[in-house]
Amino acid sequence: MPRVKGGTVTRQRRKRVLKLAKGYYGSKRTLFKTAKQQVIKSGQYAYRDRRQKKRDFRKLWITRINAAARMHDLSYSKLMHGLKVAGIDINRKMLSDLAISDEKAFAQLVSQAKEALK
């Protein structure tokens, strides 16, 4: 049985990896071995950060809500508890958006939360 060298397959595989490594710095874009390692690591970073992004946005929304609530003499936790007691079911993304874009509506929600806490 003759030996198969697989030159075409190897070249295609290497081209595919080097194409994915386009834009990397230094030898990580030109040398196959380091490019392959970096492509694998980049995939791990991407996987991790897709999950991290959700946590980061939630933290951002909470920070914005807290800042807006403190302008109305209320802490974030008391505001959220007051909204829950008042039966107002609004998520943090929408509440953060209201705090930035529509201050009057946010002030009404804060006053309802304060009433519910009394």
Curated annotation (Swiss-Prot):
GO terms in the biological process aspect are: ribosomal large subunit assembly; translation
What is an example of a GO molecular function annotated in this UniProt entry?
structural constituent of ribosome
Gene3D superfamilies in the record, alphabetically?
6.10.160.10, Ribosomal protein L20 (1.10.1900.20)
Please tell me whether the keyword Ribosomal protein is annotated for this protein: yes
Which keywords, in A-to-Z order, does the entry hold?
A: Ribonucleoprotein, Ribosomal protein, RNA-binding, rRNA-binding
Any one GO CC term of this protein is: ribonucleoprotein complex
Going by the entry's taxonomy, the superkingdom of the source organism is recorded as Bacteria
| InterPro entries recorded | Ribosomal_bL20, RIBOSOMAL_L20_CS, Ribosomal_protein_bL20_C
Q: Which family does it belong to?
A: Belongs to the bacterial ribosomal protein bL20 family.
Q: Write down the PANTHER family for this protein, in alphabetical order.
A: 39S RIBOSOMAL PROTEIN L20
Q: What does this protein do?
A: Binds directly to 23S ribosomal RNA and is necessary for the in vitro assembly process of the 50S ribosomal subunit. It is not involved in the protein synthesizing functions of that subunit.
- Protein's name according to its UniProt entry: Large ribosomal subunit protein bL20
Give the encoding gene's name. rplT
